[in-house]
């Protein structure tokens, strides 16, 4: 008897208040890295109606106009009118950055602390995941949820649907049979819109112009579409909800298809393993699947603050592995340097590449800056596995 179930993931657009905060935090990081690639940055952002607050810990010699970076990020997203709840020209921006604690710094700085190698910036556990449900080796539900809100942004910015506003959320429910996605049961898209628009016009445009162009037609035969199910979505963005950095960690990763260690990414330089080790985990898992060692691969990595080597590395392939999980884990340790310094070098992370990651997912995007999406280790892994 076939095993059937439904699985759901969501995404949000770049105009969602939490994503506005994430993008400001990563824009700050990039602006600093353009001058000082070895800076220590933990940039947090809060945005509300007409207000942006920048706080956190930054140690750098870079001279950055943080207020202007925040304003230009808000402008790029599309909040250029006070009627939208926040306007880059008139919003207040408060800056309250401190420097990194010297107690933390001595554990992270190479040559300082008990472990003379560059230690992890904190304790914690991180997960990486990949599967063969999409060409990008991502879970299908989060992949299509991202593509829907990405399409919403595209049609808003190029003027084809000029009544769209920046804030939007998508949700995709997939039907699985024996562990494989076969169709889409439900798609939800809530999109902010101009006040004069009628619901029926919004619904038709969303289904025909946003959803159908980015989702496989064969998966839409019996799909239920829920477009702005409250009936109206005019007040949105930071006016509708206060936005905070780091509140969309499942959207940022695998849409709930894999565990999450709890650490957010945006605004953090790669000495923070919350970010860099999660990127390394994706790199490892994607290469395992690309090598044909498994159909699904999940890796957990953990660290102690100030210590370079991971405290644990575990690989799970959910019964899909061509060799044992223990053997794959051994190959991972042989082919990937998972010390913080090794990750930074392996993935070339001391670059101003992070603002692009802060909307539409950190994983599963074939962007040239996203070094963790490379599959350049797959051939060596396959050979070492004897396949």
Curated annotation (Swiss-Prot):
UniProt-annotated stretches for the region Flexible loop: 100-110
PROSITE patterns to which the protein is assigned, alphabetical: ADOMET_SYNTHASE_1 (PS00376), ADOMET_SYNTHASE_2 (PS00377)
Domain of life from the UniProt record: Bacteria
Catalytic reaction annotation: L-methionine + ATP + H2O = S-adenosyl-L-methionine + phosphate + diphosphate
Cofactor binding annotation: Binds 2 divalent ions per subunit. Binds 1 potassium ion per subunit.
InterPro entries named in the record: ADOMET_SYNTHASE_CS (IPR022631), S-AdoMet_synt_C (IPR022630), S-AdoMet_synt_central (IPR022629), S-AdoMet_synt_N (IPR022628), S-AdoMet_synthetase (IPR002133), S-AdoMet_synthetase_sfam (IPR022636)
Cofactor: Mg(2+); K(+)
GO cellular component: cytoplasm
Keyword match ATP-binding: yes
Coiled coil regions in record: none
One annotated GO biological process: S-adenosylmethionine biosynthetic process
Keywords assigned: ATP-binding, Cytoplasm, Magnesium, Metal-binding, Nucleotide-binding, One-carbon metabolism, Potassium, Transferase
Transmembrane segments: none
Pfam families noted in UniProt: S-AdoMet_synt_C, S-AdoMet_synt_M, S-AdoMet_synt_N
EC supergroup of this enzyme: transferase
Annotated positions binding Mg(2+): 18
Chain sites annotated for binding ATP: 16, 167-169, 232-233, 241, 247-248, 264, 268
Cell compartment(s), UniProt: Cytoplasm
Assembly information from the UniProt record: Homotetramer; dimer of dimers.
Protein family membership: Belongs to the AdoMet synthase family.
NCBIfam families: metK
Biological role: Catalyzes the formation of S-adenosylmethionine (AdoMet) from methionine and ATP. The overall synthetic reaction is composed of two sequential steps, AdoMet formation and the subsequent tripolyphosphate hydrolysis which occurs prior to release of AdoMet from the enzyme.
Name by which UniProt lists this protein: S-adenosylmethionine synthase
Organism taxonomic ancestry: Bacteria, Pseudomonadati, Pseudomonadota, Betaproteobacteria, Burkholderiales
């Amino acid at each position: 008897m076939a095993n059937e179930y439904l699985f759901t993931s969501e995404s949000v657009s770049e105009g969602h208040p939490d994503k506005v905060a994430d993008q400001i935090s990563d824009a700050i990081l990039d602006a600093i890295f353009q001058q000082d690639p070895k800076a220590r940055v933990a940039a947090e952002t809060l945005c509300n109606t007409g207000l942006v607050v920048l706080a956190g810990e930054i140690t750098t010699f870079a001279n950055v106009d943080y207020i202007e970076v925040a304003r230009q990020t808000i402008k790029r997203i599309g909040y250029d009118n006070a009627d939208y709840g926040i306007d880059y020209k008139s919003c207040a921006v408060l800056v309250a950055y401190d420097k990194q604690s010297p107690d933390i710094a001595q554990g992270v700085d190479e040559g300082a602390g008990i472990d003379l190698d560059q230690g992890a910036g904190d304790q914690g556990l991180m997960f990486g995941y990949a599967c063969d449900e999409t060409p990008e080796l991502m879970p299908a539900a989060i992949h299509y949820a991202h593509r829907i809100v990405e399409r919403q942004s595209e049609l808003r910015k190029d003027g084809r649907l000029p009544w769209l506003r920046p804030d939007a959320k998508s949700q995709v429910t997939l039907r699985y049979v024996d562990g494989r996605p076969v169709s889409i049961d439900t798609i939800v898209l809530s999109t902010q819109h101009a006040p004069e628009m009628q619901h029926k016009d919004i619904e038709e445009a969303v289904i025909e112009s946003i959803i159908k162009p980015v989702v496989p037609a064969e998966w839409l035969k019996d799909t239920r579409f829920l477009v702005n199910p409250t009936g109206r979505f005019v007040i949105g963005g930071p006016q509708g909800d206060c936005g905070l950095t780091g509140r969309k960690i499942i959207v940022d990763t695998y849409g709930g298809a894999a565990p999450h260690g709890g650490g957010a990414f945006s605004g953090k330089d790669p000495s923070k393993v919350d970010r860099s080790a999660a990127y390394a985990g994706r790199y490892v898992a994607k290469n395992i699947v690309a090598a044909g060692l498994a159909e699904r691969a999940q890796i957990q990595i953990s660290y102690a603050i100030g210590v370079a080597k991971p405290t644990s590395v575990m690989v799970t392939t959910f019964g899909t592995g061509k060799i044992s999980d223990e053997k794959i884990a051994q190959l991972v340790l042989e082919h990937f340097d998972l010390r913080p310094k090794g990750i930074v070098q392996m993935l070339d992370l001391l670059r101003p590449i992070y603002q692009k990651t802060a909307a539409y997912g950190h994983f599963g995007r074939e962007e040239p800056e996203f070094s963790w999406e490379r599959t350049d280790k797959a051939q060596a892994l396959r050979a070492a596995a004897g396949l």
